[in-house]
Amino acid sequence: MEGPPGDLKHLFIEWLQEAAINATKKGTKAAILYNKALGSVRNYPLPINDPKTLKSVQFVGDKTCIHLSKKLEEYCKLNNFELPVAFGGLINGGVGEKRKHEVSDTSNLPDAKPKKQRKQKQYIPRKRSGGYAILLALYFGDKKKTGLTKEEIIQRATPYSDKSFKSNPSANEFYSAWSSIKSLQTHDLVDSSGRSSKSYFLTEEGYELAKQLKDAEGFESSPITNHIADLSFDNQVRVTPDSSYSKISQQLDSSPLMKTKNNKDRYGLGPSRLSSTRERILDLSSSPRLISSPLKPKDFVLRESLSSHNSTRPLQDRESISKAEDGINTKTKARLVHDASKRIYDGTNYDIWVPGEFEIILIIDNREIRSQRDRDFFQTRLTSLKVECDVRPLSVGDVVWTAKHKKTGREVILNYICERKRLDDLVSSIKDGRFQEQKNRLKKSGMKQFYYLVEDVVTSDMNKFGDMSDAIQTAMSMTMTISNFYLKRFKSIEDTIAFLASLTQVIKDQFAKNKTNLLVLKARSIKNQAEYSSLIAKFKEKFENRSTSYECAHLFSTFQDSMGKTGMMTVKETFILMLMGIRGVSLERAVAIQNRFKTPKNLIEFFFVENNHLSELDKKQLMMDVFKNEIGNKKIGKVLSEKIYDVWGCV
C-alpha cells in the first residue's frame, strides 16, 4: 500500500480553508485562529510531512494539529493510502516515536517504588472565623437536626465570630463571615435543603468537628440564650468568673484587640495608676491593637480629693486648680444659697429621682450608620443583645446614655459620652482639623466619662494611610494623655457593638449597686455652652461629695439645645471656627489670631484702617510679621499669611 504524497502542505492548506469557512458560518472565534494558521502554513518554506514540523508552524497548536491529522486519516482511507505512523499515534492519543523509544528504554529498569500518596489534611476552620462560628451555631441551635435558616444561624453565630456576618461594600468589605458557608459545604461539613428559604444542617462529619471545637473551648451552651448580666462592681469594674457576661467576654478577649491587663480598666470606670497608663502609651508603638485607659484616675461616684487629683497633673495645672478651689471655697460658696425644702440651689430649681423611678437608655446618633443600605444596623444589633436603645440626632458625640422617668417620660443626660471613628474618618478629621474641634466640643459637655472608639478598616485600605501612621499614633496618644479620654481600638463594628452593650450593663449595675439618686437640674435659660458647663460643675461640687450617692444631670433637651454646633456659641468661638475654615489654620493658630484680634471686626480694621496705606504686597505679609515671634504651630508663614489676607483683607 502506497503512502500519501511526501509534502502534505497543500492538503493542510485546503483543510484549513474549509475549517475557517465553517467556523465563520457558525460565528465562532475559531475562525480567527484557523485563518492565522492558514496564512502561516502557506508561507512556510519547507515541506510538512510529520506532526513535529506541523506544530513548529506559527499559530498551529495541538488542537489544530489533531484536527488536520484526522482529516489526513480520512483522506488516506478514501484513497487507500497508508497513514503515516507519527500522525496515527497523535490521533489515538499515544506518544510519538521519540517518546516510544524513551519508554522502551526504561522498560528494562527495575520497578520503581510507588510514590507515597500524601494524606489529605482535615479541614478545621480557624478559631473565631466565620466557619468556626457557623459550626458552633448549628451544633447548639439545631438539636432536633431539622436545620436552621441563614438568619437564625447568623443570630446564633455572631458571638463566636470576630468578623461581621454582613458585607459592607461602602467600606470595601465585600466578603462577610457568612462566605465561609461555601467552604463548609465543599468539605461536606454542612449541607442544605430547599431553594427559596434554605435550611442548613450539620453532616455527620460536621457534627463531630463541631463537638470537638465545643469541647476544646469548654463551651457548655450557646451564649445567645444568656444575656449580659451578673456583673459585680464596687467603684470599679469586676466581673464574676461564672457570670454570663464573663463567658461572652472570654470569647471577645481571645482576640488580641480585646485583651486588657485587668478587668478594672476595661471600661475606664475604675482608678488606674499612672505607671500602668504609661505602659499602655508605650505599647502604642508596638501594638496596632490598642486598648487603653485614661491617664487621669476616674472616680465613678465620689469626687477625688484635691491632693490625689493633683498628683497626676502638671505643676501649672495644679496651681491653677488650687487657686480655683480656693476661690470657690472662700467666695463662691458664701453667696450660693441652697433652699432644700423648695429644692433650689443658686437660683436654679432641681428635682430628685430615686432608684426605681427611671430606666437607662442608650441613644445613638442617627448619622451613625453601617452603610447607606443598612442604616438601622446599630439599633438592630443592640436590640438583639437585649439593650434598650433609641436613634436620634445628637448635638455632640455619637453615643450617649440617658435616664428616662417611668411616669413623666422626661429624660436627663448621664455622664457618659462616646465618639466613634472609623480609621479612615479619623485620618480625614486629623487633616481638616475636625479632630481637635470635636474633642473640644465633647469637653464642653461637662461629662465625667469620655470614650473615643476607633474602628480599623480592611487591610487593603490600611496601605492608604502609610504616610499618616505617625499622625494617627500621635493623635491617639494625645487623646489619652492630654484630653484624658478612654480610647479603645476595635477590629470590627461587631466589637464596637459588644463594647457598647456591655458598657450599658455596667452603667445600669453601677447605679443599682450604689443606689444612685439623680439630681435633675431645671435651668430656665442657659446663654451659652460655658454657662451650661459651669452650672453642672457647681451642682456636682455641692451634691456629689456626700455620703448619699447623687449624680447631677441636665435635662436631655437642655443638653441638645446647649451643645449644638452653631447654637449658643460666643463671638470668640464663632471667630475661631471662621479662621479654621482657611486651609492651614489649625486650632492653635486660630486661637493665637483671636487673642490678638478679639473680633472679626478688629481683624478687618487691621487691614483696611490701620494698614490701609500699605501696598497689597506688604499687606499680604502683615500676618507673618505680627506672629513672627510665636513658637511652634502658632507661627504663621508667608503662604498662610497671603491666604488670610485673601479672605479677610479683600472683603
UniProtKB/Swiss-Prot annotation:
What start-end ranges are recorded for coiled-coil regions in this protein? none
User: Domain named ERCC4: which ranges?
Assistant: 361-458
Example of a GO cellular component annotation carried by this entry: nucleus
Q: Where in the cell is it found?
A: Nucleus
Write out the entry's keywords from A to Z: DNA damage, DNA recombination, DNA repair, Endonuclease, Hydrolase, Magnesium, Meiosis, Metal-binding, Nuclease, Nucleus
CDD domains listed in its UniProt record: WH_MUS81 (cd21036), XPF_nuclease_Mus81 (cd20074)
Key word S-adenosyl-L-methionine present? no
Annotated region (Disordered), positions in chain:
99-124
Subunit structure, briefly?
Answer: Interacts with EME1.
Regarding protein family, the annotation reads:
Belongs to the XPF family.
Q: What is this protein called?
A: Crossover junction endonuclease MUS81
Name of the gene encoding the protein in the UniProt record? MUS81
